[in-house]
């Protein structure tokens, strides 16, 4: 399992974690924005009129209204990415990552406009009368590249099963288990049956359910967020300052957060932006293809999707996280081996009464280390002595979730009893199967 996880990390570092990913995604949006004359601004009011029904736009074929198609697409986009994804962007890239999520959304509005228009234009009416569309159709018919269309369809299927479903179901199951002691298997089976009942009814039932759930879900979420923002209203303006102040310089260390470079803010902001609104991913055109609207008008409607999803919902989430200050606070949590490393030497993020770090040089060194820059920080290799779950070995520091871990206890993975004995460590990683608990930053949802 660990080897498979390492493979996924390697794959991520060479795809969404590479320099060309934000360049290609934002670059494509910039190209279409300039080439088409800034349609995300020019047609924004038209999109509102079509969705509200003030402007009539109907085609003779189709199974859903423009609003139903929009909410169906948003039902896949709005979710874990808007909550856990935002928290993860801040955790890895600092507050400045939110700015790059906004940039991704602004240019993603044009990308969405283009892909949805094409997906609707090249849609196909199946023998049973249902409508099918998406990038695989315009790749095959418009570009005459059937093998690429087949590859896209296969990868989209994996994406739908993976990031489209697993994070949401997993996090619901975790919350239900943690807060209400509901077995994870029961939650998974219940949600699976519920989804089956909806999906078996086809696009009409999916669209009907989505058009009712999405507005209600939005109202409940905004209501809860506004309560938190009202309690922390004095920190709203400073939160915006934190986002804009270090956009091109990276985020400085604050609290338990060790800081993030400009490259990390850009990379993770763009990656989480895509995960949030799916602009350029190719999933939305499949949902929008069923609309009765004309192709160009449904493309106009789709402009609203990244705006609502990222500019509005993600911004509210970001303000809740930043204004409450929880992103710099350490919480009791179970440590993940992939997010943990043991270092040589003792490092401290302790502060004086003025809020300044007592050992700023150590923080700067750790800041460089977590950003994979040159530093004098060395990963520990050797043996650790543990007695009744407590580390006896001195002169080491445990990093977890990009923060200095505190109050660490170690237990057996098999029976959960406090561990006593010797642990072997190689390049900062514990070889034995043990569980570690303690205080550290948390990255919110498990994405």
Give residue ranges: language-model regions.
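Flexible loop linkers connecting adjacent transmembrane helices
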Residues: 39-65, 88-98, 102, 110-143, ...
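N-terminal alpha-helical transmembrane segments of multi-pass membrane transport
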Residues: 1-80, 91-97
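Alpha-helical membrane segments and immediately flanking helix-loop junctions
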Residues: 59-91, 118-122, 127-136, 140, ...
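Select transmembrane alpha-helical segments in multipass membrane proteins
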Residues: 22-28, 65-73, 145-159, 190, ...
